[in-house]
Amino acid sequence: MSTTESQSYTADIPSERVVKTTDTIHVELTPHDLDSLAATRFVRSPSAGATVLFIGTTRDSFNNEPVSSLAYTSYTPLAISTLFKIATSILAKHSCTKIAIIHKLGECPIGEESIVIAVSAPHRQAAWRAGEETLEETKDRAEIWKLERFKGGEGVWRANRDGQKGVKVEGGKEGVEAKH
């Protein structure tokens, strides 16, 4: 369905990090720089024989189009709940020791970290599988969206999934108008 109405977007990004943590799970949405070392420290355990760390960064192109920056937004209360459910499921499914999922909100320039996933498990194969599955589940299920800005001013809103079609937008960082 398309419409000729213009829709303005003003990000409602929390000014501080939003966290849900237990002894074995840490999920976080934050407008601040991501701390992969803190995530690694969280998942460290004497019963873990392997720790896997994934750091996703903003690349400078998408489908051969030059990207100038990304901006992430979310429905934060639901996204935190979804991330926690993902972490709980992965922890049980792969018999992991601990897991951390940290996602950036707001502006994320080229080369900066947008997501950190750390997983520990008694054995390396479980940690590898859990780390990859955590990333895919987060991209597929978490209520997080990104505005991918291209050089030249045009941008695309899309779910936080690679290769999915988005909604074209024009404009700067404030008051972005979506074309439907």
Curated annotation (Swiss-Prot):
Keywords: Cytoplasm, Molybdenum cofactor biosynthesis, Transferase. It is an enzyme of class 2 (transferase). Pathway: Cofactor biosynthesis; molybdopterin biosynthesis. Its EC number is 2.8.1.12. The keyword Cytoplasm applies. SUPFAM superfamilies: Molybdopterin synthase subunit MoaE. It catalyses: 2 [molybdopterin-synthase sulfur-carrier protein]-C-terminal-Gly-aminoethanethioate + cyclic pyranopterin phosphate + H2O = molybdopterin + 2 [molybdopterin-synthase sulfur-carrier protein]-C-terminal Gly-Gly + 2 H(+). Substrate binds at residues 123-124, 139, 146-148. One of its GO terms (molecular function) is molybdopterin synthase activity. One of its GO terms (biological process) is Mo-molybdopterin cofactor biosynthetic process. Its main location: cytoplasm. Pfam families: MoaE. GO terms for cellular component: molybdopterin synthase complex. The keyword Cytoplasm applies. It is found in: Cytoplasm. Residues 161-180 are annotated as: Disordered. Heterotetramer; composed of 2 small (MOCS2A) and 2 large (MOCS2B) subunits. Catalytic subunit of the molybdopterin synthase complex, a complex that catalyzes the conversion of precursor Z into molybdopterin. Acts by mediating the incorporation of 2 sulfur atoms from thiocarboxylated MOCS2A into precursor Z to generate a dithiolene group. Belongs to the MoaE family. MOCS2B subfamily. This is Molybdopterin synthase catalytic subunit. The lineage of its organism: Eukaryota, Fungi, Dikarya, Ascomycota, Pezizomycotina.
